[in-house]
Amino acid sequence: MMTQTLLIELLTEELPPKALNNLGNHFAAAVAEGLEKAQLVDGAAEYTAYASPRRLAVQVKNVKAVQADQKIVKKGPAVANAVKDGAPTKALEGFARGAGAKIEDLTIVHDGKQDVYAYEYVQTGKLLGELLEDIINAAVKKLPIPKVMRWGSSTFTFVRPVHGLIVLHGGDIVNVSVLGLQSGNKTLGHRFLSDGEITIENADSYAEQMREQGKVVASFAERKAAIQTALEGQARRLNAAVAADEALLDEVTALVEWPVVLEAGFEEHFLAVPQECLILTMQQNQKYFPLLDQNGKLMNRFLLVSNLQTEDPSHIIQGNERVLRARLSDAEFFYKQDQKATLESRLPKLSGVVYHNKIGSQAERIERLQSIAAHIAKALGADAAAAERAARLAKADLVTEMVGEFPELQGTMGKYYARLDGETEEIAEAVEQHYQPRFAGDKLPESKIATAVALADKLETLVGIWGIGLIPTSDKDPYALRRSALGILRMLMQYGLDVNELIQTAFDSFPKGLLNEKTPSETADFMQARLAVLLQNDYPQDIVAAVLAKQPRRLDDVVAKLQAVASFKQLPEAAALAAANKRVQNLLKKADAELGVVNESLLQQDEEKALFAAAQGLQPKIAAAVAEGNFQTALSELASVKPQVDAFFDGVMVMAEDAAVKQNRLNLLNRLAEQMNAVADIALLGE
């Protein structure tokens, strides 16, 4: 059957830039899925998504003009129940009537179990035009649009008003109606650079015609690549590097249809303002690309992406420089104003900054942070007074002009203002770094002082918010407690601190009776659960479960234990020892009395005597290896007792009739279990 390329384009008003690429990809995928389900393509649809500020489009290869005819078999009642006394039963008559057939038209087929009556017929395939309207409308309804709008007198809704619809199969218009628009083959190009209406001659020529006649690079991916290449080329020419993330590049790509990268600049005196402020202003407010020199310092040059191409771009450059100058002047003003007051003098204002009405203001938080940070610093062997001072100043920049304008700079501006106030560099850095890690993969605080304040901040948040009942759910975590827990865990995996003790310290910093009394135990369990999630990114679930079953309170050796268990699992004896350990644990659950020391005089059989001797020899080796942090050696030592363990279970009845003998054998197994599980609960391996 002959196939051709299908093109669908929705011509819109300017689409939301941050959502554009996602909308384009979803629309294209939904159309392709609809064509596949309608069997208008063979196999998986081969398609290209297009998305620019004023259009969403999809181009699908090898689309049929008509569905293939299908043989349909409708199965009815069993032959045995369909005829009675030579006459059709009501069941058979009802089936024939429902199928639109006469009884003599029915055939008999086997359904895999029995013979049944069936009606077989050929369903003629539908034309593309009969199916496409529903496919497009379904694709539009599936789009991830949080808010829709109406336009004019239309009752239709979409993310933005839609003014044109192209539906072409090859060079032929497919007549459909979508969002109140009749399909055609005409569209508009660039708002300023094109000469008006463009007639798309063929579905295959869409991208080329849009580029040549419309001055529109319709492909989001192609525009993005072109912008990135141009930015990098301009930066190399200036011996600089572009300061930009993927999100900014995506947003700028969504704002232009014909990207032109231009170089501009600003006055050097603005560089006296902390570069983080200037970079944020350029990126966030103006969508510009700042440039950094070889030392990572901001230059007074930047790159912008224009949606216009002119012979003389100087007026575009000057206009953008003028707008940026006003923005940078504001930042400069805020910076100078903030320097008129020290961070210390700003602290009283924190009383008016409510953190949560149940646990007080930021000023009250500061009191708690100081005590927690000092406690942690002592445990780390760091300067407790410095940690307390850093915690005292940590939130002071929240009431500065600069942070009021750019909340993203909290901590960063605190660092600069602390330096200007004469605080030590260690304290200034701690003020900034106490927010770290802000997200998964973010760097950790560099010093012990900064770590103490960062831990204090996150612990106080976790314990306080949890304690007033704002516990994270599967879909809600407004105070980012999961993120706080992850940050705490990552820091504690570098330092040998007791996580439960730190949680209790944070809990004790709140007024008595303010928080739920179960908070320490509940948050400790929450931390264990988050630790499992974190570790399962790098280790199998059974290995993580084995290590965490010991409920480690110090996390600095957890990774070493995971690595040791992973190595142990590869030993030939591992599976048998894990099974034996599980058997031991099941037997110990049956103990009637408290387990104690082994009475050597009650050992009767050679197998239990041999196991006792092996356990005796094993104990000091494992204890020494664990004390030295050599967990792999501790686990590998277990392989040496496998013969004695096997012989014991083959030849000894643990639950002997003699109560004293039974208790003694359970005591022996308990001693063995302590050694087998010194590093991890190996019974969980393989589960």
Curated annotation (Swiss-Prot):
Its main location: cytoplasm. Keywords: Aminoacyl-tRNA synthetase, ATP-binding, Cytoplasm, Ligase, Nucleotide-binding, Protein biosynthesis. Coiled coil: none annotated. It holds the Pfam family DALR_1. The keyword Cytoplasm applies. One of its GO terms (cellular component) is cytosol. It catalyses: tRNA(Gly) + glycine + ATP = glycyl-tRNA(Gly) + AMP + diphosphate. Belongs to the class-II aminoacyl-tRNA synthetase family. Tetramer of two alpha and two beta subunits. NCBIfam families: glyS. This is Glycine--tRNA ligase beta subunit. It comes from Neisseria meningitidis serogroup A / serotype 4A (strain DSM 15465 / Z2491).
